[in-house]
Amino acid sequence: MKVLILSCSTGGGHNSCANYIKEELTLNNIECNFIDFFDIFGKNAKKMSSDIYLKTLGNNGKIFKNVYKAGEFVSKSKLQSPVYIFNKMFKKKLYEYIQKNNYTLVITTHLFPSLTLTAINNDKKYKHIPFLFVATDYEPCPFMEEANPEYFIMQKTLENAFIQKGISETKLLNTGIPVSSNFIKNAKSIRSEYNISDDENVILIMLGSMGFGEIDNIINPLLKENIKIIVICGTNKQLYEKLNEYKNDNLIVIGFTKNINDFIYSSDYVLSKPGGLSSTEIASIHKPLLHIYPIPGIETYNTLFFGNNKMSIKCDTDKEIIDNIKYLMNNEEICKEMIQNQKKIINENSASDLVKFILDHFN
């Protein structure tokens, strides 16, 4: 067996999920490679997809919200979407790439390559390519129903949402959003590296891979609480430089990091954008969680899923963020309940369970 993992650089979660799957496959001695889908078609294609995504995040995500709503509307119409037609254009080159490199199974963590693979399998002049589509959020996205993989990998209890989109129940594998076993078991405390004592409260603020969100209005009030604050800025250099101007010993500013598990493990409370993968990472390490600054659309659904299952608290305003962090700090029982719900609902063995399934069904 030789596995190709395909993602797209539209938000960090899709790529992180792909890397977790690669890591788990490698641990099981399965030959595999991970590549950005658009890298197969050249730098221009990749840059175009990334630029379009970044532009939709403008105006505090309002453009993305409108695009997402339009997508939901078109998806309900059951007509062939422009998204499918666009990705269909890449089928010949993707097919040739897969055949040339002798891949026997493809795993996708993004809609785009899933639609291209579906177009390949719908064309009788090509050999069938078995593939799995990993849903990295807590709601099926628009046009997901146009993909036709062997299986959709998704979160348990969301079966009805997928079925309502016209996806067959027989294609659902509810092992959960994959987070590698090493991410969880290798997480370690890094408090001593940042001169944080064991008795100090630490708030971790995660703003996504691109550092999305204005946090000035919450940083100042939180610094008055005499607690340590760690902010992960991702690739947002402007935010990184701006926060470093505070020159406050209680504020630790981090750019892009590959050991986010250590920062989650070392914190007492986490404030995070409600990305599907990042929320799963936090819940897998079991931390009280506030969801902040959702990108309207799919992240709204992630917030609802976590909130409805009492795994996080949704904060819509700066005041709610400040009030709720104080609420958690003064209510240990609420934090314990949140953590218990995370343990009950989120599968810590999601990646290893997926690999076991692959070995049983595709080896």
PLM features: residue spans?
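Conserved N-terminal ligand/cofactor-binding loop architecture of enzyme catalytic domains
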Residues: Y20-Y95
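Active-site-proximal region of nucleotide-activated glycan assembly enzymes
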Residues: K124-I184
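A short helix/loop element that forms part of the nucleotide-sugar donor recognition site in Leloir-type
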Residues: I184-I196
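Donor-nucleotide binding loops and adjacent catalytic segments primarily
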Residues: I196-S266
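Acidic donor-binding loop of glycosyltransferase active sites
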Residues: Y265-G275
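C-terminal "capping" alpha-helix adjacent to the active site of nucleotide-linked donor transferases
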Residues: N308-I334
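A short, well-ordered alpha-helix in the C-terminal region of glycosyltransferases
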Residues: Y327, I334-E348
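C-terminal alpha-helical cap of glycosyltransferases
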Residues: N347-N363
